[in-house]
């Protein structure tokens, strides 16, 4: 199973700029599910697709219904000689941020100071903003999705195109990470899930009583460094298309 975060979106760019300039919000004029890819994001997806097509043959593709994920999936699949069945899957959509959607850290502190205090008290993992989700909420739906895969996709290769929080949630569930272990990954800038980064698992029959999926790569960036969205991802980027 290969899990890929969507390519760079217009909101990713606006969010980064807003944090640097101290703005309160970014991209609230467009619904989160309607945010498209940037031109650079399209190139990231195309390059990642070329890499994947040389190494994997997928039987099924599951994609978040958010536009940026759907665009990423279609662009990545272009180089594949065999086009697998593609399914839009609500359970791997972006984490819902509720009233905090589109706000920077400064924006949350300025507009909802009590919510910021509650988040500090409850911690990032368990905090649920009004109208939004916590990490455990996301884990519940991803756990349900994994149950569907176990039932319907046994002995198949699967590609999942989703979002950074969902990628980390897959790791939490598949590797049985604790809250502390997950947040340590989330806090480390060197482990920040890059746009179009690949995380993949392979079934290991020797693991556990009846075998389980074993992590083979986390956050692999397989496109040229000049297409990377951040300095951290630029350091990870390498070109290895296998031509």
For each feature predicted by the language model, list its residue ranges:
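Phosphate-coordination/substrate-recognition cap region in phosphate-metabolizing enzymes
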Residues: 1-2, 10-11, 43-117, 187-199, ...
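Short, well-ordered beta-to-alpha junction loops that form the rim of enzyme active sites
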Residues: 6-7, 63-67, 91, 131, ...
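Acidic, low-complexity terminal tails and accessory targeting/binding regions
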Residues: 1, 82, 95-107, 156, ...
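Internal catalytic-core helix/loop-beta-alpha segment
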Residues: 128-151
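GST superfamily/GST-like fold recognition
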Residues: 164-168, 214
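Short glycine/proline- and acidic residue-enriched helix-loop micro-motifs
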Residues: 28-36, 117-136
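Glycine-rich phosphate-binding loop signature in dinucleotide/nucleotide-binding domains
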Residues: 54-57, 149-156
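An N-terminal RHG(E/S)-centered segment typical of histidine phosphatases
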Residues: 1-58, 71-82, 207-243
């Amino acid at each position: 199973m290969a899990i890929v975060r969507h390519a760079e979106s217009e909101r990713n760019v606006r969010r980064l700029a807003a944090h640097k300039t101290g703005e309160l919000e970014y991209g609230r004029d467009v619904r989160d599910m309607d945010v498209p890819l940037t031109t650079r994001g399209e190139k990231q997806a195309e390059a990642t697709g070329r890499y994947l097509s040389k190494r994997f043959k997928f039987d099924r593709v599951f994609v978040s219904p958010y536009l940026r994920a759907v665009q990423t999936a279609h662009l990545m699949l272009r180089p594949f000689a065999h086009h697998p069945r593609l399914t839009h899957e609500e359970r791997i959509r972006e984490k819902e941020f509720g009233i905090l959607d589109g706000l920077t850290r400064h924006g949350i502190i300025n507009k909802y100071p009590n919510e910021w205090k509650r988040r500090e008290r409850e911690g990032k993992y368990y905090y649920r903003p009004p109208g939004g989700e916590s990490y455990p909420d996301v884990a519940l739906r991803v756990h349900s999705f994994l149950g569907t895969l176990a039932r319907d996709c046994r002995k198949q290769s699967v590609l999942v195109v989703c979002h950074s929080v969902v990628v980390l949630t897959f790791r939490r569930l598949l590797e049985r990470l604790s809250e502390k272990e997950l947040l340590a990954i989330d806090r480390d800038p060197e482990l920040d899930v890059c746009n179009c980064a690949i995380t993949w698992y392979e079934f290991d029959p020797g693991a556990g009583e009846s075998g389980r999926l074993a992590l083979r790569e986390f956050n692999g960036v397989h496109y040229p460094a000049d297409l990377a969205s951040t300095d951290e991802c630029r350091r990870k980027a390498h070109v290895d298309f296998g031509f």
